[in-house]
């Protein structure tokens, strides 16, 4: 018999759910309810990545965990400004955050962001993305240090679901850590 770890909350013992190791994001979870408050992020793994899955939190928790030196503080401030811009459009439900910023790298160079439209694939979703393409993806990178990607529900099958794609480790990141190419890592979701 496999025993699950026991946790204690206010003096009451309970067993962790049987499926606590599975990724948080599943296609059928849409739409996820809004999360408020400071949701604590899990500790980084031994290899310096978030545990596998999508970790829902807020910007304060991201700041607390990852803005740990002057360079990271600067990157976080740029991210915060970028997400404020995206949020003020009212056309995006959430942002997924990934890249070296959400690892133990001392000097990450940028942040990967996936904006998810609040409407499904179609003209309204493309209209939501339009201001960002008008600004220019390269210009956004120069100003905010953000590699920008988009996702909307119902994208055709040939389109890459970056939410899943960014959970895979690149071979050049996996090999130095002694991980295989199929290894996965976590990403962060922040509601806008």
Language model: regions and residue ranges:
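Structural signature of FAD isoalloxazine-binding scaffolds in flavoprotein oxidoreductases
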Residues: 113
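Catalytic core of pol beta-like nucleotidyltransferases
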Residues: 25-96, 102-109, 117-192
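N-terminal amphipathic/basic-hydrophobic helices that include classical n-h-c signal peptides
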Residues: 1-38, 118
């Amino acid at each position: 018999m496999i025993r699950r770890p026991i946790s204690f909350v206010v003096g009451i013992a309970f067993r962790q759910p049987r499926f606590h190791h599975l990724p948080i994001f599943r296609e059928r979870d849409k739409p996820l309810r809004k999360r408020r408050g400071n949701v604590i992020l899990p500790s980084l793994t031994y290899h310096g990545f978030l545990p596998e899955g999508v970790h829902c939190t807020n910007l304060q928790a991201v700041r607390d965990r990852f803005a740990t030196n002057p360079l990271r503080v600067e990157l976080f401030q740029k991210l915060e400004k970028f997400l404020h811009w995206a949020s003020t459009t009212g056309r995006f439900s959430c942002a997924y955050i990934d890249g070296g910023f959400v690892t133990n790298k001392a000097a990450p160079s940028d942040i990967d962001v996936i904006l998810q439209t609040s409407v499904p694939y179609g003209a309204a979703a493309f209209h939501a993305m339009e201001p960002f393409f008008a600004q220019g993806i390269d210009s956004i990178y120069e100003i905010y240090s953000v590699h920008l990607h988009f996702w909307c529900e119902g994208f055709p099958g040939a389109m890459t679901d970056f939410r899943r794609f960014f959970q895979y480790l690149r071979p050049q990141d996996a090999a130095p850590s002694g991980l295989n190419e199929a290894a996965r890592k976590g990403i962060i979701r922040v509601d806008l």
